[in-house]
């Protein structure tokens, strides 16, 4: 599981950098400032959670079962949260109205929060 978590973290980190550069250079010409800021929010949260997964994957104190649960909450949360933000920020560049799927953004955010809560509870329950 550690290998899967760490490779996923590396992929999320790499794509966050690519998307950040894409937003700063290519999208700067076609999006307004609010849309660019929204896009950047998606990039930031993707990178935050790439680093979080890297920590989880490298940690020796987190049980494998807990790692697996956190992994699935975080990866689904990033896809829903950051993915929907990318689509919503670039909505005017496509023929499809991505505002129809905007409801998944807060669901993704909730999944990210649950991943953090799961880590908190796991550490809180450990004997001191």
Feature-to-residue mapping (PLM):
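Polytopic transmembrane helical bundles with strong interfacial aromatic enrichment
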Residues: 1-128
């Amino acid at each position: 599981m550690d290998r899967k978590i760490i490779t996923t973290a590396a992929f999320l980190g790499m794509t966050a950098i690519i998307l950040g550069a894409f937003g700063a250079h290519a999208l700067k010409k076609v999006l307004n400032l609010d849309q660019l800021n929204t896009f950047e929010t998606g990039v930031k949260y993707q990178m935050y959670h790439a680093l979080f997964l890297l920590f989880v994957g490298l940690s020796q104190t987190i049980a494998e079962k807990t790692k697996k649960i956190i992994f699935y909450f975080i990866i689904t949360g990033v896809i829903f949260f950051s993915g929907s933000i990318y689509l919503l920020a670039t909505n005017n560049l496509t023929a499809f109205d991505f505002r129809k799927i905007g409801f998944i953004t807060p669901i993704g955010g909730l999944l990210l929060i649950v991943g953090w809560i799961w880590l908190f509870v796991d550490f809180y329950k450990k004997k001191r």
